[in-house]
Amino acid sequence: MSAITITDAAHDYLADLLSKQNTPGIGIRIFITQPGTQYAETCIAYCKPGEEKPDDEPVGLKSFTAYLDAVSVPFLEDALVDYATDRMGGQLTIKAPNAKVPMVNEDSPINERINYYLQTEINPGLASHGGAVSLVDVVDDGIAVLQFGGGCQGCGQADVTLKEGIERTLLERIPELKGVRDVTDHTNKENAYY
C-alpha cells in the first residue's frame, strides 16, 4: 500500500487534466522539495513516459500511474491529495503532514540531529519571543556553533537561554556533543525581546 491517498475526486480531476495533454501513458509525479525542513513543499507534476526516475515508486491508479519520488516517500506518509468543488470551480489540495518533519535517528549525522532538536524543541519556545536559533556549523570535535535571530538577537537573556536551555537540551539528546558557542552579534538590539 502506498504512503499517500488520492481521493476519487482528485483522481478524476487529474485524469481529466492528463487526458487533455494528448500524450499516451502520461502520469503524475509527486515529490517534496527540501523534505524534512521548514521549507518543504509538496508538488505534483506531469510525468511523460520515460520522465520517471528509476527509483520512483509507481502507484497504479484506475486511469494513470502516480510516481512517488523515492526520497520523498517517507515524508509522504499519511499524505492526502483531494479535489473540492466550489462556486469558482474547484481546487486540488495536497496535505502532507510529515513533509516538514525531519527524519533523524541516533545514526544520523550530528548536524541533522542538532537541527532536528532546534526545530522541534528549541525554536517553538523561542518563537513566543519572536526569536529563533540556527546551526552555523559543528567544529572542534563536537562544539555546535549557533546563531540567534529575531527577538533573541541582542536580548539580554540570550546567554542564559544558550547555557540553561539550549545547551542543556542538546547535551541531553546528543551525547557526543561537547557544547555550544554563540556567534551572534548581540550589539544589534533593534529587535531584542529584553
From Swiss-Prot:
Which co-factors does it depend on?
Answer: [4Fe-4S] cluster
Gene3D superfamilies recorded = Fe-S cluster assembly (FSCA), HesB-like domain
What Pfam families does the entry give? Fe-S_biosyn (PF01521), NifU (PF01106)
Q: How is the cofactor bound?
A: Binds 1 [4Fe-4S] cluster per subunit. The cluster is presumably bound at the interface of two monomers.
Q: Is this entry keyworded 4Fe-4S? A: yes
GO BP terms: namely: iron-sulfur cluster assembly; protein maturation
Assigned keywords, A-Z: 4Fe-4S, Iron, Iron-sulfur, Metal-binding
Q: Which domain of life is it from?
A: Bacteria
* Positions annotated to bind [4Fe-4S] cluster: 152, 155
What does this protein's UniProt record list under function? Involved in iron-sulfur cluster biogenesis. Binds a 4Fe-4S cluster, can transfer this cluster to apoproteins, and thereby intervenes in the maturation of Fe/S proteins. Could also act as a scaffold/chaperone for damaged Fe/S proteins.
Its family? Belongs to the NfuA family.
Q: How does it assemble?
A: Homodimer.
Task: List the protein's name.
Answer: Fe/S biogenesis protein NfuA
Per the record, the gene is: nfuA
